[in-house]
């Protein structure tokens, strides 16, 4: 009997690891075009002679479709086998990217990028939902973030030379090949039975909805704050008289710090209380925003930019893990996918309006972004009260 009881955890281990591999692999590939946006946009302009408006529409289609994938997922997520959904999304993603590599028609390319991102968004929802079912979601979401940043950084390094030889097709064919390599991992997703199992216990539904609403608001506030500041951080450098080459070098190093932030979060996992980790992460993020005030010199600007990038990638896994504790069915993580896209769109739009209304000054933006980050922290801390969590025990 003792031998059998010791064998069970060992048998469960490969399933947990393979699910983690699927989550990290698919989540890294899906947003790769957005993560490599500077290189891809430059190639689209030079090869296809696209102007800023057309390029902007392409990237808006990618981001918009990934977020809009949430809407059909409300229907299929609780009803369809997640593995079957993953296989279908993988097939559509590969087909759309291969066709994108061969088309020379802009309207057709725009449509194909929308379809590719819709399939990718569905995969991202599956990744977010599957991570919520694991025993250590903090670690899973840390690796989820780290995979995206690492592939994006590698792409920014590799793509210019590949574009020189193969053109824009290198990006789209490369994504199709990477997705094909990851395709067998689709069978590692849960089948989605957790949703029906959770709905069978309705006693805490009202309480869970209230907590879910607070979690969604916290996530939205976090993304509005970070995207509003990060979008215009280059403008802060220019207004401070920092050389573009120097600021570019700082941003390149910041990418590595972003990978380090997510990696640190995944290493810590559940070893420390999540409330303390959120406090530390938000303290770093808000300190970075305040360091950007009043035309920082090079050293202060570099410190702020590096600290900002490290802190937000460190915080994000713990935000997602907080949401995962509230709901394991996938519904809340599905909504989170839409909220992330919304926050990334709302933040820069509001920030631009604030900057324009203040004569180009970013002072008020930085102060308000710090307050919004503090609001996000307060909401998240209110969700950290000890409560039973058998799903991850």
Regions found by a protein language model. Give the residues of each.
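Helix-to-loop junctions at the C-terminal end of transmembrane segments
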Residues: 69-82, 261-274, 355
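C-terminal transmembrane helical hairpin of 12-TM major facilitator-type secondary transporters
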Residues: 273-319
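A late C-terminal transmembrane helix in Major Facilitator Superfamily
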Residues: 326-361, 369
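A membrane-interface helix-boundary motif in multi-pass transporters
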Residues: 51, 161-177, 352-373
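Helix-loop-helix hairpin linking two adjacent transmembrane segments in secondary transporters
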Residues: 134, 143-191
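Extracytoplasmic gate region of multi-pass secondary transporters
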Residues: 38, 211-252, 256-259
């Amino acid at each position: 009997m003792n031998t059998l009881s010791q064998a069970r955890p060992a048998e469960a281990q490969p399933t947990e690891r393979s699910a983690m591999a699927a989550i990290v692999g698919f989540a890294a590939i899906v947003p790769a075009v957005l993560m490599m946006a500077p290189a891809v946009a430059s190639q689209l302009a030079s090869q296809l002679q696209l102007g800023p408006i057309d390029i902007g529409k392409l990237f808006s289609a990618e981001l918009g479709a990934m977020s809009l994938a949430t809407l059909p997922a409300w229907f299929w997520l609780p009803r369809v086998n997640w593995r079957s959904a993953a296989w279908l999304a993988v097939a559509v993603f590969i087909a759309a990217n291969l066709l994108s590599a061969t088309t020379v028609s802009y309207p057709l390319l725009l449509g194909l990028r929308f379809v590719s991102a819709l399939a990718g968004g569905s995969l991202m929802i599956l990744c977010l939902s599957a991570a919520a079912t694991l025993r250590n979601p903090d670690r899973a979401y840390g690796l989820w973030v780290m995979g995206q940043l690492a592939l994006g950084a590698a792409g920014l390094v590799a793509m210019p030379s590949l574009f020189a030889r193969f053109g824009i097709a290198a990006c789209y064919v490369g994504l199709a090949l990477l997705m094909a390599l990851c395709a067998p991992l689709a069978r590692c997703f849960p089948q989605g039975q957790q949703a029906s199992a959770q709905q069978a216990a309705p006693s805490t539904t009202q309480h869970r909805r209230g907590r879910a609403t607070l979690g969604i608001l916290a996530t939205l506030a976090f993304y509005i704050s970070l995207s509003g500041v990060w979008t215009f951080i280059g403008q802060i450098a220019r207004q401070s008289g920092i050389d573009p080459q120097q600021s570019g070098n700082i941003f390149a190093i910041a990418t590595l710090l972003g990978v380090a932030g997510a990696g640190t979060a995944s290493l810590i996992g559940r070893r420390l209380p999540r409330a303390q980790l959120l406090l530390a992460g938000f303290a770093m993020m808000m300190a970075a925003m305040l360091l950007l005030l009043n035309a920082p010199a090079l050293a202060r600007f570099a410190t702020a930019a590096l600290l900002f990038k490290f802190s937000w990638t460190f915080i994000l896994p713990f935000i997602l893990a907080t949401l995962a504790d509230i709901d394991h069915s996938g519904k809340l993580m599905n909504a989170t996918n839409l909220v992330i896209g919304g926050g990334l769109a709302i933040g820069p739009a509001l920030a631009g309006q604030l900057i324009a209304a203040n004569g180009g000054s970013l002072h008020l933006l930085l102060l308000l972004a710090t307050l919004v980050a503090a609001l996000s922290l307060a909401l998240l801390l209110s969700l950290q009260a000890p409560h039973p969590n058998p799903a991850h025990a």
